[in-house]
Design a protein with these regions (language model features):
Chain A
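Membrane-interfacial amphipathic/re-entrant helices at transmembrane-helix boundaries
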Residues: 1-19, 47, 59-62, 88-94, ...
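Inter-helical junctions in multi-pass inner-membrane proteins, predominant
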Residues: 1-12, 159-164, 193-231, 256-264
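Interhelical loop and adjacent transmembrane-helix boundary motif
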Residues: 1-5, 47, 51-54, 208-210, ...
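Membrane-embedded helix boundary and interhelical linker motif in transport proteins
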Residues: 7, 29-76, 80, 259
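Short, non-helical or kinked segments that cap or interrupt transmembrane helices
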Residues: 14, 25-45, 59, 89-93, ...
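Alpha-helical transmembrane segments within multi-pass membrane transporters and channels
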Residues: 56-102, 109, 244-249, 253, ...
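Transmembrane helix-bundle core of multi-pass membrane transporters
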Residues: 84-85, 91-162, 189, 255, ...
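Helix-loop-helix "hairpin" substructures at the membrane interface of multi-pass membrane proteins
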Residues: 133, 137-215, 239-245
């Protein structure tokens, strides 16, 4: 039973980490708490579902469609909200409040158009084969989620650490003004970050919709709460932190259910979050005076 | 609100104070708002039954006149509409309201005015304890869940179960309370009780724990939104145990959301579209002809309620005095027995908050069904 719960913790943690990745990127670079990330996540799931239902494509092209749509949404988000607010030097809270508005609008629009009920992917599009090792059941989808979370994060870490774009991103995170003086295309990089973060959110939306096999307008809301917790545990804006924080929260929840009781799940998980903040106010990886992209 | 009432009168061709030889029946249901998916089905059930009664000679030659009002699924509006129907339209009896919540608020108005109020969809505890003018033919979960468990236990031989329920929703929690009581009464052991919250998407940790306690079945109090993924994830974890569900799981949506993982789910219901009783077949065919879609439980219960009230009205000798007629109807109603779309039915007197006899609940056998290859199969 413990072995099965460890697998459960890994796949749930992978889901949280994937969601938190895009969220933390926007915070690290744009310095915005993007509360529309849950809505983007939901749009990704609807886009992939629509691609499968209407155009009868298989899963991989559907994920590509979702990436395209959410990338577009990220572009609009930056052009419509982040860029004008940056230009007018709006206070920190303004973009956050604006993203709440975007989130509510988008969710209502989707609800109005597709209805509020649960939708699901047709059965034949899902990889349903399971791997049985001793008494442990592993779904191939779980394996893919875990591997994809690790790959995406590894890729992002490499880009940020070792590429010139990464260097520019780090400079940008430190000081947009200084970066601009050094010849970094600040507006373009901000836009690119918003697009990439939205694509990450959209793809994780598809994966989670597949994992739970349900798509509904408010699916982003609970994820957003967990995502904020993950990002805070890991350290705001830190990519490694999103990974560790995601698995930390996943395991905390699973082990609480296994050994304490499901009634206490959120109390224990968020109690731990609180204790981490008390001991390390900047999160596991955050370093208060410095910022990392 | 007056405008909307007028609109309904226009739409349904019902005008107040016309010919004297008409029996006025007030209908207050949620026709707009969140509860309208129930209220609209209920209205269709009433209209179908009233139409049939009219075309077979009415009530001893008198016509039925339906005065339909929208109570919007809101307590305040239900009270307003009740007052209008009782004092202005001077109806003989009232059907409605749609939600138990509204019934708690509005039924005392009818009780005080001494007018029969007949609910077809109120399942909460305590509605009929309001007073002796309160009737309902909606069967409560407190009656259905023990029957479901009993049949499931007989057929599958289960002796210990694990319980899984949503702990942040009033409906799934009250359904859990009823399950808990039924499990105690039937002396079925509980290996573990687990919970989840609205909006949860991953239930594998709870299911893994349940699997480790080796139950014979899983009792599940959930709405379909969470219940269907729970069934899918259980099957993915290799858990092939039967599920025993509350009313929240009694929906054809299960077959869409948990397709091919939906087998072996036991649910109880006061009505089933599959029921082969001749009265039900006739109802389903007539409803389909009128509306081009299959009826649901709410339409069936409303349809039966109109016939139950008609049985009582046939016994009345109408006087010129409305108060006397209203009282006579109340006295005639408890004795009515009826076999309709939902099967054999009679009333049972409930006790009030003061311990004295009060209103009347439904006595009806629950239909227990199990899912098999994406449909419900009735179990005897």
């Amino acid at each position: 039973m413990l072995a099965q719960q460890i697998i459960n913790g890994l796949s749930l943690g992978g889901v949280y980490a994937l969601f938190a990745l895009g969220f933390t990127l926007v915070f690290g670079v744009l310095n915005v708490i993007n509360l529309a990330h849950g809505a983007i996540f939901m749009i990704g799931a609807y886009a992939a579902l629509h691609a499968v239902l209407v155009f009868h494509v298989s899963l991989l092209p559907a994920i590509f469609v979702a990436a395209l749509v959410t990338g577009g949404a990220g572009w609009i988000l930056d052009k419509l909200i982040f860029a004008p607010l940056r230009a007018s030097r709006a206070p920190h809270l303004a973009p956050m409040i604006a993203t709440i508005g975007v989130s509510i609008c988008v969710t209502s629009l989707i609800e109005g158009y597709f209805g509020s009920e649960n939708l699901r992917f047709p059965l034949d599009t899902l990889p349903s084969s399971t791997l049985t090792l001793a008494s442990v059941q592993v779904n191939w989808l779980d394996v893919k989620i875990i591997v994809l979370a690790l790959l995406l994060m590894g890729g992002m870490l490499w880009v940020i650490r070792h590429s010139s774009t990464g260097r520019a991103l780090r400079a940008l995170a430190e000081s947009p003004k200084a970066a601009a003086l050094l010849g970094v295309n600040v507006g373009g990089l901000f836009l690119a970050t918003s697009v990439i973060a939205s694509i990450l959110g959209g793809v994780s939306g598809v994966l989670i919709a597949l994992y739970t096999n349900s798509v509904f307008p408010h699916m982003g809301q609970p994820m957003l709460h967990k995502g904020i917790a993950v990002v805070i545990i890991g350290g705001m804006g830190d990519v490694r932190g999103a990974l560790i924080g995601g698995f930390f929260l996943g395991f905390a929840e699973v082990l609480t259910i296994a050994y304490i009781g499901s009634n206490m799940r959120d109390a224990v998980a968020f109690g731990l979050l609180f204790s981490v903040l008390l001991l390390r106010p900047a999160g596991l990886f955050g370093q208060a005076p410095q910022r990392r992209a | 609100m007056r405008c909307r009432a007028l609109l309904f009168i226009l739409v349904f061709g019902v005008l107040p104070n016309t010919a004297a030889a008409q029996i006025k029946i007030g209908i207050a249901e949620a026709l707009t708002g969140n509860a309208s998916q129930y209220g609209v089905a209920i209205r269709k059930g009433f209209e179908l039954a009233a139409g049939e009664i009219a075309s077979s000679g009415g009530i001893n030659g008198q016509k039925l006149e339906l005065v339909i009002e929208d109570e919007q699924g809101k307590k305040e509006e239900a009270i307003n509409v009740f007052k209008k129907l009782i004092f202005q339209d001077k109806v003989l009896l009232l059907f409605g309201p749609t939600l138990s919540n509204s019934a708690q608020a509005a039924d005392p108005v009818a009780q005080a005015a001494k007018v029969v109020v007949f609910g077809t969809s109120n399942t909460a505890d305590g509605i009929t304890s309001i007073g002796n003018y309160v009737f309902r033919n909606s069967v409560t979960e407190a009656d259905i869940l023990p029957a479901t468990l009993k049949v499931a236990a007989q057929k599958t031989g289960l002796s210990k179960v694990a319980v899984l329920y949503g702990n942040d929703d009033i409906f799934t929690r009250s359904s859990y309370d009823n399950f808990k009581k039924a499990l105690q009464d039937l002396k079925i052991g509980v290996t573990t009780t687990e919970t989840f919250a609205k909006g949860d998407v991953d239930f594998k940790p709870q299911l893994t724990k349940i699997k480790g306690t080796n139950p014979d079945a899983i009792v599940l109090s959930a709405l379909v939104a969470e219940g269907a993924p729970i069934m899918v994830q259980a099957r993915q974890l290799g858990i092939t145990l039967p599920f025993v569900g509350g009313n929240g799981m009694n929906s054809p949506r299960v077959f869409e959301l948990a397709r091919d993982h939906s087998d072996n789910l036991w649910v109880g219901s006061p009505w089933s579209v599959e029921s082969s009783a001749p009265e039900n077949k006739r109802f389903v065919a007539a409803y389909q002809k009128a509306h081009g879609a299959l009826p649901d439980q709410f339409a069936a219960q409303a349809y039966d309620a109109m016939y139950i009230a008609a049985q009582a009205m046939r016994k009345l000798k109408f006087a010129a005095n409305l108060d006397a007629d209203r009282r006579a109807l109340r006295d005639a109603l408890p004795a009515v027995q009826w076999s309709g779309a939902t099967g054999p039915f009679k009333f049972r007197q409930a006790t009030g908050r003061d311990g004295k006899p009060a209103g009347y609940d439904a006595v009806q056998t629950a239909i227990v069904m199990v899912t098999k290859r994406n449909q419900y199969v009735i179990q005897k």
